[in-house]
Amino acid sequence: MARHRDSRSPSPTGSHHSSRRNRRDDNGRRDRDRRDDVRGQRRSRSPDRRERDRDMNRRRDRSVGRLNDDYHRSGRRERSRDRRSYADRERSPDRRRRRSRERDYRDRRDDSYDDRARRRREDSTDSWSRSRGDETRGQTPRSDAGAKVNDAPKVSTPAVQTEEQKKAERLAKLEAWKKKMAEDKERKEKELAAGGTRKLLDAIDQKANGSPSLTSPNSPTTPATPATPGDLAPPTNYAGKFDPKAIAKKAVASSSSAHTLGKDLPLKELSKASATLTSTVKGLQADKKPTAFSSTSKVSALPKTRGNLSVFGLGAKVTDNEKTSQKRALDFDEDEGSRKKLEKLPSLPMANTEEDDAALANGVEEQDDDDDADLEAAGTEEEAAAAARAAAEKREERLQEAEAQPHTNGDVQMEDAPQPDSTAMDEDEEIDPLDAFMEEMGDPFSLPKNNATFIKDNIKSQPQEPEPLFGDDDVDLKALDADPDEILAIANKARKKKDIPTINYSALDLPPFRKNFYTEPTELAEMTEAEIADLRLELDGIKVAGKDVPKPVQKWSQCGLDVKSLDVITKLGYERPTSIQMQAIPAIMSGRDVIGVAKTGSGKTIAFLLPMFRHIRDQRPLKGSDGPIGLIMTPTRELATQIHKECKPFLKAMGLRAVCAYGGAIIKDQIADLKRGAEIIVCTPGRMIELLAANSGRVTNLQRVTYVVLDEADRMFDMGFEPQVMKVFNNIRPNRQTILFSATMPRIMDALAKKTLQSPVEIVVGGRSVVAPEITQIVEVREEKEKFHRLLELLGELYNTDEDARTLIFVDRQEKADDLLKDLMRKGYPCMSIHGGKDQVDRDSTIDDFKAGVVPIMIATSVAARGLDVKQLKLVVNFDAPNHLEDYVHRAGRTGRAGNTGTAVTFITEEQEQYSVGIAKALEQSGQEVPDRLNEMRKSYKDKVKSGAKKESSGFGGKGLERFDAEREATKARERKIHKIGGDDDEEEKEEKDDDVLLKAASVVQPAASTAPPKLLGVPKGIDLDGDIKVHRTEPAATTGSKLDKVTSAIDAINARLNKTGQLRSGVPIDNKGPDAGAFHATLEINDFPQKARWAVTNRTNVAKILEATGTSITTKGSFYPAGKEVQADPKLYILVEGDTEVVVTNAMRELMRLLKEGTMAAADAEGRAPVGGRYTVT
C-alpha cells in the first residue's frame, strides 16, 4: 500500500522519501520558484525545511500505509529512542483529532502511488544512487538498506545559502542566459542574411529532420560539447526540469523490454513527450557519469529495426540505456503542459546543451514573436488536419533529398512510418476550451484565417524566424470563400414559396368511378308534382333549383344506403331524416353537385357524410402511395375536429380510415397518418396545401379524390381562402363530385359556385340566412359600461333555474375575451376563453371541457361561431354586436339545435348603428319583432348612407391571401437589409426589388374610404417616393409700393381659392419667409400616409438627425384631414424642407422618403401580425 502524500514523521535526510515531490502544494511552490529563478539554477529534490507545526495534514509513522514503502528499516532500530527524540515536539489540536491515518487515507489517496511503489521495487539501488550522486544539498542520504550513507562529493556552494546570495546567483545566471540567447539570435540573423531564403528553408529542413547531434547544423565550425567528464556541465548548474513524479511513472517500463512507447504512457501525453525527448535526455545525461553521454546522440536516431514501430515512429525495441533515458525524459514537462495547454513546445535552439536545458526546464518566457501566430493558426480541426497533411507531404519530399537522419522537435520521423504519425502532436493535443475561446475573441473583426493553403510568399511576413509553420497574415482566402452565386441560389431556394405540383389530368389515364347509387323508391315515383310540392312545403319549406332534382325521401331506408350505415344510424338514435337530409341525400346519391343551405343544427354534416361512405366503398382499396378519396375542407379547426368525430362511428363499422389535418397541430403526426393510408381527410385549406407541397408532393396527392365537400363554404371564402381553395380544386380531377354546405349563402357566392360546380342542385331549407324559429332573440341597446352588469343579471337568472345549462359569450377582439374572462372569474363564475390567438391544444381542451360541463361558461370570438355543437347550451350572449348578418345567424345558431330551444341576447351601442341593419333584418326574416330603438338606429344609418356620409358594407368578402404574402415578403426584405453582409454585390443589386416589395406590402394600410385610390397602393396619389425630387428656387419677395401690387394681390386671391382643395401645387407660394428660409426648398405631403409613417418623419429624434446631417430646415405645415373629411382652406399636412443648396435639400428629402417607406412598412407589418387586434399573435 502506498504511503499517503502527507507524512507526519520526518524522513531521513537524503533518502528517496525526502526527495519525492509528491505534495501538490510542493508542485505549486516549485512552479513559482522556477518562474522566479534564473535559468540554469540548481534544483533541490527535497521539500523545503518548514516548521512541523504548520503541516496540518501529516500522518503518523505507525500507519500501515508504509508497510509497502521502500523505506527499509533496520532491525536494530530502537523505536523508543525515536519517540524520545520527538517527544518534546509541540502538536496542533488538529493532529490530535486525526491521530489515525487508516480512517480517511483512502479518500485522499492517489492511485498513481501504487504504480510508483511497484516501480520503485523494480528499480535498483544503483539507479537511485546515480540520480542522487550530483545532489547539491549538503545532506547525508540514507542508503536503501537504511544503515549506510553514500559518499557524495562535496559541492562548492554551501548547503544553506542566504536569500541575498541566492538572488545574486539567480540574477547572474539570468544575465548569462540572456546574453547567450542574444548571441544566438544575432548569429541566426547573420546566417539568414548571408544564405538567403533558399538557405533558410534548407536550414529549416535540416533542423526539422536532421539528427539530434550536439553540433548546430547551420554552424559546423562551432565545436560541440565534448563528451569528456572534464568538459561536462558542472554539477552546480541547473540540469533541466526534473520531476520525480514523471520518473516514477516511467519507471514501470523497465519491467518488460517489449513494451512500446505508446503503451507506457497515455496518448494525450505522448505527443508532448515526443517534443521534449531529445532536449531532456541531454539534460539528464549531463548529470550522469561520462559513459552515458555518448549514447545521447543516438537516442533520437532511427532504430535499427525499422519494421517494429510504435505509434510515434519510434522503435519498440531499443537498448536499455535508450529506454531509461526516454522514460525519464518523456514527461518532464508534465506540470507545465497540464497548466498551459496552448503553450508552444520549444524547439532545440542552436546553442550548447546546458544553457538549452536550463531555458527549456524553466519555461522560456522570451519566445519568438510568431508564437501567437502559430497558436492562432490552429483553426478548426479540419483546417489543422489539412495543414498537417500539407506539412507531411513536404517532409516526405525533404526526406528523400536529405542525407542526414531527420528529426523534428524531438520526434523521430521514419520514412516508412504511416503518414498520420507526423500529425500526432496536432491531433492529440487537447486545447483548453477557455484558452481557445479567448483566442477566438482576440480580434472579432479579423478576417477568417485559412490554414489549408501555404504560399511561399508567407515567408515575407516572418523573415526572422526559421519555423516550419508561418503566420497567416497573407494567406489566400479564396479557399474559404464560397461562390456568391451558389449562396444566393441556396437562399432563394430556401425562400422559395412552396407550391403544389401541377397535375395534367388530360394526359393521365384515370380509371372511371361511379357516382350514381340512388334508385328512386316506388312510393316516391308514384307521387305527383303537386304532392311533392306539398311535401316540400311541409318540410320547413324546402326550395330547390336545378334540372331533374330528385324527390325528397321520408325514411332512411329510401336513401339507398348500405346495411352497415343503417345499423350505425339506428345505434346513434336517428329515427328519421331532417328536412335538409331528406332532400340532400337523394341528390348527392344521384351523383349531382349540390349546394345546400339550411339553418344551424339541422344535420347538414350527416347529409354529406352518408353518401360519401357509399361513394368510397364502391371504389377499389387504397394501394401504396394512393391519396384519399374523400376530401372535406372547413374554414376553422374546431369545425374540422367536430366533423372528424362525427365520422368515427361509421369508420369503425365500415373499416375506413380518416385523418384530421389542421394548422396549429404537429404536422409530422398528420403526415404519418396519411402515409399509413386514409380514405377520408378532413382539413383546413392552409394545412392541405402544406401537406401537398411537403417533400415535393410525395407525402400525399389528390389523384384519387372524387368526392369533395366544402362545409361552411361562404365563411371560407369570406375569410380569404378563395385562392387556396381554388388551388386545391385545380389539382383534383375535373369529373369530381362537389358538395357545398352552409347555414348562410349570400348571393355573391353564386358566381363562385358556378366556377367550381357542374350543373348543381341548389337546396335551401328555411331561407338563406335565417335564425331558427326555436331561438328566442333579444336585442338591447346599451352603453358600453352597462353591458357587464346586464350580463351578470342574465347569468344569475339562468343558473338560478338550471344549474346544468351552458352559456356562450361572443366578443369581437381577443383582448376583450381575456378581459371579460378576468372580470367574470372575480365575480365567482367559472369560465374559459377561446380565440385564434391561443394554441390549438388549448382551444381543443377548452371546447372539450365546455362540452363536458367542467366549465359552464365559455367566452369566444367568432372562431367558435361555426359548427360548434354543444348540448345544454341554453344562452348565447353577443357581448359585442356582430358586424354582418351571416355572423349574427351563426352566433345565434349555437343554441336551439336539433329541435331544442334557446335564447340569444345581443348588446349594441349607439355608436354601432351600422350593425343595426343586419340584426334588424335577421329579426324580420325569423318572424320576430324589431325593437323600436333598433329600428330608429337602422333608419338613421340608412339616411346617412343616402347622403354619402356613410358607406354601406355587407361585411362579406375576404381580402384573399395576397395581402399576407406581400407582408411576408416585405418582412423578409427588411430582414435582408438589416442583416446584410458587407461586400455582397448581390444584395446591393436586390435593394431596388426589396423597395418594390415594401411599397407593395404597404398597400394594405391605404384607407378603404379614400375617395381617390392611388395607382401604387399605400402611397398617396401624386407622390412617388422613388421618383426624382423636385427642388424649387425661392423667389425674392416683391418690393413694397411696386406697380405690381395689384398683380400680387390678385395672385394671392387665386392661390387662396386653389388652397381650398388641399393640394400643394407648384404655383402655390411656400410659407418660408422666416429666419431659416433658404435659397432652395421642397415639399412632401404626408397627410394620406399611415400614422406610423407620419410619426416617423415628424418626431424630434429623426428630424434632428436629418438636420444635423444636412444642415437644412424642416417644418411641418398644414392640417391633418382624415379620409373622407372635407378639406378646408388650410392645405393638407405636408413637410417643408429648406436649404442653402439644392444638394442638401435633395439629401434631406431622400431621407424623409426613406423614413416614410419604413413607417408605411411598420404599419403594414403591425396590421399583418394582429389583424383583429389584441395582444396575441399566431405564428
UniProtKB/Swiss-Prot annotation:
A motif (DEAD box) lies at residues 711-714. A motif (Q motif) lies at residues 554-582. ATP binds at residues 598-605. GO terms for cellular component: nucleus. Keywords: ATP-binding, Helicase, Hydrolase, mRNA processing, mRNA splicing, Nucleotide-binding, Nucleus. It is found in: Nucleus. It catalyses: ATP + H2O = ADP + phosphate + H(+). InterPro entries: DEAD/DEAH_box_helicase_dom, Helicase_ATP-bd, Helicase_C-like, P-loop_NTPase, PRP5/DDX46/KHDC4_KH, RNA-helicase_DEAD-box_CS, RNA_helicase_DEAD_Q_motif. Residues 1-167, 180-241, 250-269, 318-427, 941-994 are annotated as: Disordered. One of its GO terms (molecular function) is ATP binding. Residues 585-763 form the Helicase ATP-binding domain. Residues 209-236 have a biased composition (Low complexity). It is an enzyme of class 3 (hydrolase). Residues 365-384, 984-994 have a biased composition (Acidic residues). GO terms for biological process: mRNA processing; RNA splicing. Residues 774-938 form the Helicase C-terminal domain. Its EC number is 3.6.4.13. Pfam families: DEAD, Helicase_C, KH_12. Residues 23-93, 101-137, 180-192, 319-344, 391-401, 941-953, 960-973 have a biased composition (Basic and acidic residues). It comes from the Eukaryota. SUPFAM superfamilies: P-loop containing nucleoside triphosphate hydrolases. PANTHER family: ATP-DEPENDENT RNA HELICASE DBP3. ATP-dependent RNA helicase involved spliceosome assembly and in nuclear splicing. Catalyzes an ATP-dependent conformational change of U2 snRNP. Bridges U1 and U2 snRNPs and enables stable U2 snRNP association with intron RNA. Belongs to the DEAD box helicase family. DDX46/PRP5 subfamily. The Q motif is unique to and characteristic of the DEAD box family of RNA helicases and controls ATP binding and hydrolysis. This is Pre-mRNA-processing ATP-dependent RNA helicase prp5. It comes from Botryotinia fuckeliana (strain B05.10). The lineage of its organism: Eukaryota, Fungi, Dikarya, Ascomycota, Pezizomycotina. The gene is prp5.
